[in-house]
Amino acid sequence: MSTNNIIEGDEDTKTTITNESNTDNNNNNNDDNKNNTENTTSPTNNNNTNDNDNNSDNNNNKNNNNNNSQVTEEQQVTLEDSGSEDDINFEEHELSDSAEEDEDEMEDDDEDADGRQNQNPNSAGGKRRGRPSKVQQSTNTHLSQTTPESPTIFTPDGKVPKRISTSTNNTPNTQSALKTNKRPRLTSDEEKDLMLSEESDGGVGEDDDSIMSTNDKPQDENQSNQNQNNNNNNNNNTTTTTTTTNNSNNNNQNLNQNNNNNNNNNNINNNNNNNNSNNDNNNNNNRPARGRPKTNGSRSEERKRIQLQQYIQATQGSSTTTSDPNNQNNQINQINQNNQNNQNNQNNQNNSLGEEEFGEEFEEEEEDMGQPKKKTKYKTSKKSVPNHLDIRPCWFVGCVKADRSLKILRPCLIPTCKTHAIKSEVRISEALRRGDFVNDESSGVKDKVCGICGDKKDLHHCGNNGCAFGFCNDCVEIAAMKHNNHPNGNKWICWVCQFVRTKAKEKERTRWVKEQLNPGLTSISRKFRRGPELDMAQAQFLQQQQQQQTSPNEKRSSQFNSNNSNNNNNNNSNNNNNNSGFDPSGSPNNQQNQKRLRKKINASSDIYETRKYTKKRNDEDSAPPSPTSIIGNSVMVGSSGAAGGGIIKNTTVVVEQQGYSATPPSPNTLMVQQQQQLQQTHQQARLSQQQAQLQQLKALQQQHQHQQQNNGNFNNLIESVLSPNREPLNPIDNFVDQTFTAVKFFSTLSQNPPDEIKERIDNFVDLMMRIKTVRWASDYGLVWRMIEELSNLIKRNLLSSQSVVEMYSELKSLEEGALENMTTNARNVPLERAITMVFENHETAGLIGKECCSTRNALIYSIEVALRAIADYQHDLEDNLMEESLRSNKVSTEIEQIEHQIKANLDEIHKFKYQEVELLDSLSKVRGAIAAHESIRDTLQKKSSELKVDMLLIKNGISDKEKETKSQQATLENEIYALKLLITMVESIYWIHDYFYESRVGECEKLINNKLSQLQNKLETQIPHPPNALDNAIPNTTTTVMGEDGQPVIVPTTVDIKNKFKTIAIYHKICMQHKVPNFHLEKPDRIQVAVSCINEFASNPLVDIFDNPPEVDMRYVMAVHDANYIKKLETSLPPENSEFETHLESDKSGAMVTVASHKDFEGDDDNIYDTFVSHRSIKAALRASGSVCAAVDSVSRSGYTRAFCAIRPPGHHAGRYGRTSDAPSQGYCLINNVAIGAKYASLTAGYSRIAVVDFDVHHGNGTQEILSGDDNFLFISIHVCDEKRYFYPGTGQDVGDIDEVSGQFDGNILNIGLKRNTGSAVFLQQWMNKIIPRLEAYKPQLIFLSAGFDGHKDDPTNGLKLNEEDYFVITKMIKTVAFKYCKGRIISVLEGGYGIEKTNSLQRCVNSHLKALIEDTDEEIHLANISYGHFSETQETAIPKFNINNFISNPNKRGKKNNLNTINFINNNMNNINNNITNSLSNKQLERQKQLQQQQQQAQQAQQQQSPQQSQTIENTSITTTTTTTSTTTTLSTSDSESNNNINNNNNDYNNNNNNNSNNNNNNSNNNQPTNFNSSTSSPILSGNNNNNNNNNNNNNNNNINNNNNNNSNNNNNMNTSNPTNQQSSVIISDDMDDVQTNSNPPNPQYPLSPNSVNRGNNPSNISMSGAQRSAPLIISPKPSNSPNSPSTSNNNGTPQNINNSDN
């Protein structure tokens, strides 16, 4: 007898089929199958076969032992394709739910592992991998041939093992037939190539078992063929049989033959010698199932019920018998009859099983007796040898399974598992849609994603031009280790290309790409949706549908083996189901698919007999009968599915024996008889479950009928937009599809809808995707109805809208001529149709609005209901928590009781310990172990305590660090607060100093300068030239000497007023590296012209040339320009070796624009893209700005008066963001050099009034944008400005003129626009009328010139008609203002001027400008001496009183008056200063009157007593004394580093005799205390005290003033030296304050009071003047005395004067 054992494993496990009668022993290579099903099968676990696939896979062995049949190649292809097609049709469904099924499969794999470990007691430690040894293989072969198996073996404790039972029939598994087969479907030609290549290779791949075709072998070889496949981990091989299906008529005849011969009909693998030659030979192998049996509540069971409905509808649609709804009752009755037959046959099941056991035992004893088995020479010819490519684990890190390969890489097999293979192919499919995965490899483009994992990483690409594969590093490590081919450069050939060459196979990549691009083609392997899976009752229902079409012979055979015929019919039903899972009508291979389906429907099982089985049967017939063998006749045992709707597995045993046999029964027979009662109990439970499933089937049928009534044909349901192959399951899907279709149509009506509509469309798509992912667990009936109605309305509206659009296009297409030729009725037809459609559209739109409102209300109501449900759930949760708390209290009470019991037990344990002494040595070992564990416990406790201590120490350290950190933080915060206060104090004291220096100290300095100038004019003593004076001196003073006649004679003397005002010229050679095209005007040759002009003045000693200025600090560049603009400018330069320049423009955001255009250089600037940049342009621009900053340092700190910067590129058109908003371009400019220099001067040198004069022919719009609104700067520009803005840049209309009402200028911008081709007269008139007065009113401290010489009449720009003499004149005008107000400080920066080729106008203009700038006339020098060198006789009124209201004139600039204490302090000090000044003036006035009287008296006495000789002696003495005195007089030192003749009075010691006349009571103590003033640009603070005696003890810088009090009451006018050895003598200048006090003239408006004005203050004390750059000292002539004994006058006040002239 033969039995078939069904072994369950993973989905891709290869099932070995062994026919004991045919001696085909197959040892499977199943790595994951650890089950030992020998003697451990149970009918109670038949539901474990739910996932078995009965269709033959391409991976299964084909054991077609048909001796007389000849199978053609076409039939063989059909054989190969028949099983896989059923499985593939439903793979698409599985792919859509891959995420859920992957989780289920992982859980099933874990459950399978547990089940296999429990089931296989003979496996050593549950080992999973490894090949069995030769001994184990032989043992397995012996057991598979001789060991009988009972269908159900129970364990001694009465439990049933987890794995499932045996089956003598290859029953088609209806549900598992619908299980997904991951093997890709191949076409006929591909399958033939695959079979031929595998047979020629002699082995199998990782996914393909050896495919053996019996047609290629002799008849005898087919009978004795043995396929031995090594099963690595299956220690006990199980035996199964295959069912070779044939036509149904032949199958029934064979069954009848077997019955007449009294053989066992359960052996279905008998050879049929009478088969026709055209029969299809199918070998349907049972694929092993995976996982534990599913329960009714699992997700897979829910899917099965849904799939059942689809399957029934599909079969009804393809069969006339099942499509009629009236036949449903007949079908149900047939199912009931089948259930009753199964229940009746249950009683006879055990007898057949027992007889089967007996037969198997007899066969085992026969072989034990030493009878050899027949073996053929082809036994191991097709032995399945493990492939050398079988590498594990999976390429995914951490995955241990590898039973698959990526379809995209075949024939190169990369080990992977199902989960990661699907995920990888999904990622590669997405990359294919994005374009990262190449569609056509012949293009030579390489992939951007890995061909194994699908990730976008760094790839190693194949060197073959026809291969686009690339692999990442992680995947290369595994694949290279497998194939021994590491990437070694650009010529590396990948593994896929190698295997294509060696195996001569086709690449799978092209087919896979076509599948993804054309998913509807059935010839391309693709994953279809999984079809419905059927439970037991549904399978029987479909079986009886097929039985109605069978012949009477089949019906008779089905009485013996109903399950067998049902299973054969299930194959046909599976074929029908394929039509529902995938519609082949849309495929180009429709006829071929229908042909295959028809073949499968007509196919049936054939029974074949082998020689061994025939011989064995004859031996059994000749043996005498046995009493124990007569148990029953033709008993059919059917086992139905268990709970959860398992698949029916029938174990059919037909026992027909006559007589008795002397052979004793096997020992297992008794065990089988004892288990019959338990089997009947389980069978009854299954029948009850079948009844319940029958009720479910009825409900599904009713639901199906209802859907057909509502929706018509099931196959014509609405197709989902997001998943076209998926049928909508609820109204939400229908609603989403209808709305999406409507939105998609409406969006096509307008190409540019409003932004609001676009946003709504985007939000709609986002919401639609979210709703599609929601799984509705609750039933919202009202919402569903409203949604369905709204969907229908939307559909109607969409149709009507489409019709309206079509009608509109139709009406629009009609031409007027056609309408005129048509009749009235003909013209009205389309109009009436359009009106009708519009009316219907409006009506539908109104209904949609109402329906939307009602749907919204229904949704709100449903939300409220859901919220109430949530509240109920929360309430239930609270109740559960309360119950759990009560339970926990109860449990805690029980725990306490248990602990009490434990304590009692411990006491008893102690008692038993006293008895341990009396025990044997074994007890001592126990005590030793206890002691050891206790020591370990103590050690661990000690370690834990130490760790706790360490943890506490760490916590303490952390707390200390936190405290320390907080304290430091608090300290830093206090310091920051203090620094902020200091900043506020510094700002306050600065503005206080600024104010008082302007209001008080400046007045005092001014009065002192006026008085000194008066005294200078009164001195008549001749002063010779100093050694270093210049030769060109002019006589401007006279000296009074005594003549021979004793009368005073006035002699003219020469005083050196020719001062050295030095000029510095700055340029850098990098400025020439700013490259522009040859046609451009702003060329590097302009710098060569300017430098050549500078070199002409190199011989002048007053001119210095500096050719290496540093780059400007980027901080000052950022103070002028936007940081983003500078960053874009630095990153937008062309490469270093580029032959082309780049056009550069920018908007306000700093974005660069490159345009292939250039400026029209012949005249107007029509084209706006005129600025070019090269690789070194930014370096040149930074050096240019650095030159201007170096000029500021030279003028402010290095003793130079003027500076000229020959730089490029120009900058006065560059605004804060590059191009200004009102200009068309940047006008050749990159960064604004003049603006950067002005900001630099303001920030570093402390200038508060800086004037920028731009006389370029183009308006300096960039400089105006940067400096506008800042009171520290004044910008003046004279340029060409047309009304129509034709001339570049079109900006700079007249602005900034004086206000006629207020007489003041408005703002800090003065623009003077000239008409084009204006001449010199108008140009110079504008300078005299507007520019010079504006500068006079502003009184700048520093002047910048944007020197643009493109206004010349010969310049290519043709803007103005000026000459080079005009630039000479305006430069002289600027110098005049500079000498008057800013000590001659001028910085000239080259801007425009492009006449360098023909006219050479630039050279002439620069020469004129430099000549006027460098060479000083006598009038200019005299103006400089008057302005800030000599003391002019300006008469001012009395010093004004201090007013606290004028303390802060501009709150926005100087801050708010928020510190009252500071204001009060300053107010008190200034009041004291006012009082001191008033008292000092009054006292000095009285003293002056007395001194004048005394001098008059002394002069009269001297004239009367003096003789002619004495007069000559006195004259010589006075001249000598005067000469000696002038060498030591108070001089004004300059900061010129080159002048060696400067006299620095900072370190001079003035020994002034303070003559305290005891008779003079008018001397004030204030006269003995000098007051220090420093008149630098950054003025110090005038500090006073509250002393009413006005004692100001201030010492000057390193000046030691020794006032010796000589008590000389008689001669107060003599000058006395305190140190007789000192050769120097000081000049005591009489202070005449009467002229100042009596002068009532108003102040001169040309010399207003300012911190930097020349005449500062009235207190004759220590004065430090800034900004006078002179190499020769100015000599102050003392006033001669009329007395012969008094060559010089003396100041009665004894106030010394130390005049220190230092620059900033």
From Swiss-Prot:
Residue ranges, compositional bias (Basic and acidic residues): 186-195, 608-620
Biased composition (Basic residues): 372-382
Cytoplasm found in the keyword field: yes
Binding residues annotated for a divalent metal cation, in chain numbering: D1256, H1258, D1350
Coiled coil: none
InterPro entries for this protein: HDAC_PDAC, His_deacetylse, His_deacetylse_dom, His_deacetylse_dom_sf, Ureohydrolase_dom_sf, Znf_FYVE_PHD, Znf_RING/FYVE/PHD
EC number, UniProt record: 3.5.1.98
Biased composition (Low complexity): 15-69, 165-176, 222-286, 326-351, 540-549, 561-580, 1491-1616, 1677-1698
A Pfam family that the UniProt record links to this protein: Hist_deacetyl
Subcellular location as annotated: Nucleus; Cytoplasm
Record-level GO cellular component terms: cytoplasm; histone deacetylase complex
Binding of substrate, residues: D1165, G1227
Listed Polar residues bias regions: 70-81, 134-153, 315-325, 1649-1669
GO terms of biological process kind: epigenetic regulation of gene expression
Keyword Coiled coil tagged: no
Region (Disordered): 1-303, 315-383, 540-634, 1485-1704
PANTHER family referenced in this protein's UniProt entry, alphabetically: HISTONE DEACETYLASE HDAC1-RELATED, TYPE-2 HISTONE DEACETYLASE 2
Similarity field: Belongs to the histone deacetylase family. HD type 2 subfamily.
Protein name: Type-2 histone deacetylase 2
Naturally occurring in which organism (per UniProt): Dictyostelium discoideum
Organism ancestry: Eukaryota, Amoebozoa, Evosea, Eumycetozoa, Dictyostelia
Gene name tied to this protein: hdaC
